[in-house]
Amino acid sequence: MSRISSLQDPFLNALRKEKVSVSVYLVNGIKLQGQVEAFDQFCIVLRNTVNQMVYKHAISTIVPAKSVRMVYSSFNPYHQNANDDQDENVDDIHSDELEVQENQENINE
């Protein structure tokens, strides 16, 4: 498993397991909405009224509609936490925080 996948996989898996609705922004500006049905190293299957296979290289941002609880493996070199002695670290990703960041970026453009 690559280092990049060690962050993507838990995030996408949490979205899939919790059946969280997501907005997927593509690099060309198109917004797709649905639920993550499945994913692999190269693509994500997004379910709405139909299933769409979206290649990861075309995705800019994935925004969950609600908070997602993520479990990081302790070997993940990219995740730093004050509780490094624990076997796993848990973070909440809040879509409202991501929206604020997105709005600030739009204002700065």
UniProtKB/Swiss-Prot annotation:
A GO cellular component annotation in the UniProt record: cytosol
Keyword annotations from UniProtKB, A to Z: RNA-binding, Stress response
Keyword flag tRNA processing: no
GO molecular function: RNA binding
Sm domain residues: 9-68
GO annotation (BP), single: regulation of translation, ncRNA-mediated
Recorded superkingdom: Bacteria
Subunit structure: Homohexamer.
Cross-referenced HAMAP family: Hfq (MF_00436)
Family as reported in the entry's similarity comment: Belongs to the Hfq family.
Reported function: RNA chaperone that binds small regulatory RNA (sRNAs) and mRNAs to facilitate mRNA translational regulation in response to envelope stress, environmental stress and changes in metabolite concentrations. Also binds with high specificity to tRNAs.
Protein name, as recorded: RNA-binding protein Hfq
Taxonomic source organism: Francisella philomiragia subsp. philomiragia (strain ATCC 25017 / CCUG 19701 / FSC 153 / O#319-036)
